């Protein structure tokens, strides 16, 4: 947009559409587009002492580039309250309103939580993660019956694909899967 205002929204949109899991962890100050990035991450972890805010309206501008993402993540009521008040809040409140999934009490705990989460993510099949993200992002945007039909088709394709075969074989053999084209 004019003056480069679309750059933050473009980056946030890319994060939403990424075919891999987007994990965000923060412990310091996060404001404006940073809150938008936090809102679109698939997994969101924070320190309790983190300071988050939406200062845009206090600066005379709307949080235009991140507003749709905040509404989708937090719901209209909560997103509107934060935006029209220039809301400032900590990591505990971020969890309470649904912006973050878990809170860590210090930097070491956040690093440990991130490491555990990344290990969990890396155990999952990359292709299955990509399809899952697409299905979940389509939820609410596509008619329910069409979404279910698409989900059934995606499942059938995945089950017959290399990842589906390896995943089920590993399960039956009681071992960790060795994902084609990736490292577990």
Where are these regions (language model features)?
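A short linear-motif detector with a strong N-terminal bias
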Residues: 1-4, 31-32, 61, 136-137, ...
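Glycine- (often His-adjacent) and acidic-residue-rich active-site loop
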Residues: 1-14, 30, 142-143
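Compositionally biased, intrinsically disordered low-complexity regions
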Residues: 3-6, 10, 38, 166-169, ...
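Short C-terminal domain-edge/linker segments immediately following a structured domain
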Residues: 5-8, 56, 75-77, 162-165
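Hydrophobic alpha-helical segments typical of transmembrane helices
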Residues: 7, 11, 65-66, 78, ...
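Crotonase-fold acyl-CoA enzyme core
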Residues: 14-127, 175
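C-terminal alpha-helix plus adjacent terminal tail
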Residues: 86-92, 108-112, 116-184
């Amino acid at each position: 947009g004019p003056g480069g205002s679309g750059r933050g929204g473009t980056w946030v949109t890319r994060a939403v559409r990424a075919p891999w899991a987007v994990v965000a962890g923060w412990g310091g100050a996060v404001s404006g587009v940073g809150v938008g990035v936090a809102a679109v991450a698939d997994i969101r972890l924070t320190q309790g002492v983190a300071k988050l805010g939406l200062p845009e309206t206090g600066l005379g501008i709307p949080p235009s580039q991140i507003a749709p993402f905040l509404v989708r993540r937090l719901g209209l009521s909560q997103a509107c309250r934060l935006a029209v008040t220039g809301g400032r809040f900590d990591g505990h409140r971020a969890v309470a309103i649904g912006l973050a999934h878990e809170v860590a009490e210090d930097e070491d705990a956040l690093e440990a939580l991130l490491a555990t989460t990344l290990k969990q993510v890396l155990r999952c099949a990359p292709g299955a993660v990509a399809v899952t993200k697409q299905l979940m992002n389509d939820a609410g945007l596509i008619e329910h019956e069409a979404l279910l039909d698409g989900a059934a088709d995606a499942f059938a394709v995945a089950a017959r694909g290399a990842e589906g075969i390896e995943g089920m074989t590993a399960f039956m053999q009681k071992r960790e899967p060795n994902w084609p084209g990736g490292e577990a």
